Amino acid sequence: MGATGVLLCVVLHFLQMVTQSSEKFTVTGLQRPVLAPLGGNVELSCQLSPPQQAQHMEIRWFRNRYREPVYLYRNGKDLHGETISKYVERTELLKDDIGKGKVTLRIFKLTADDDGSYHCVFKVGEFYEEHITEIKVTATSSVMYILMQPPNIKGVMLECHSGGWFPQPHMEWRDNKGNIIPATSKAHSQDENKLFNMTMTLLIEASSHRSITCYLQNLLTHQEESISIVLSGELFSWKRVWIMILTTIGFMMIAFCMTYCVQQHLLYGTFSKGKCHWLKSTMIFMFSVIAVTGVMLILHLKQRVPVSDQHFELDTLWLEDISVILCVLIVFIIKLISFIYFRLEGDHQGWSLPPYLSATPTAAICRLAVPEYSRGHLQLDSEDDLAGMGPSPFFITPCF
């Protein structure tokens, strides 16, 4: 055997040793997720164990279970053509320690879409090992604002808005003592950059909470942001004013009715139906007010649309409009009923008999309504004159 044969045997033996050693390795790296801010840079390292030469190996970085190649190193070259386009200009493989089996993937300008798991794969021939590292992209926004809807029949509606969070933050209402107030509704959406826009509402039905704070927290970094609003007690005074107005109107109606009827009693000695016309109209008015007020209360107290529904505000405005329309209808209907009632009452009054006939049986049980002569003068001197009139177009109605 010559020198060439000896050299060939040495090379083959060396390659065999390299192959055997290469088939006996594992890949290690970071065990905890890597927290990285939105728009920042991150480095992911992986290491062969035991440490060994890795220049002759194929090194790949994948996402989503090998479906998205992030970086490829093979035969000592970086192959950008086999990676997805969004990582071509934003990734770099640091190979300073590749002789010891360590490489580092650097990703620039992180986006919310970069959040997830990354597979680091070392491959020699058909043998390969991998390590999985997770990136947690975080974003916190200080842009917050509270919108207050105009007070309505349900109360005061507060809306807290904040955008630009990742991942989805924890959101809640708190009072001035730090106690949690249950939110009426919560909603979120994601923009084209996959950042979360948060919305939370709170319906305050009483003035017990004067200072309200909207509180958000990033659950990964525990960073907090908050904004507060102080509510004036005047926002809830409209309820007391409304109750006082209705109470005052009710007492005024009762007082007017009693005063008028007492006056009629003092003047005529009895509460005759012919004298207390205003009592009848007042009763009609009170009945109408009670009926319509009852309908309004039923509409207001009945829960038709949940507060969390997007049509809640429209439903509230509809109730307010209906309330105004009902009040206008009350006034119109009462005016119309009163006009028709007193007009008909005046048309059917007719004429009454002379005083000296009031004790006679005929005059005591009837009232003569004479349409043809109601605007003239009819003279009756005695009951015989009444009996001698014979048939006539008189309408006999009971006396009241």
Curated annotation (Swiss-Prot):
Keywords: Disulfide bond, Glycoprotein, Immunoglobulin domain, Membrane, Repeat, Signal, Transmembrane, Transmembrane helix. Residues 139-225 form the Ig-like C1-type domain. InterPro entries: BTN3A2-like_Ig-C, Ig-like_dom, Ig-like_dom_sf, Ig-like_fold, Ig_sub, Ig_V-set, IgSF_BTN/MOG. Residues 1-21 form the signal peptide. GO terms for cellular component: membrane. It is a multi-pass membrane protein. Its main location: membrane. The keyword tRNA-binding does not apply. Residues 22-240, 302-321 are extracellular. It holds the Pfam family V-set. It is found in: Membrane. Belongs to the SKINT family. This is Selection and upkeep of intraepithelial T-cells protein 2. It comes from Mus musculus (Mouse).
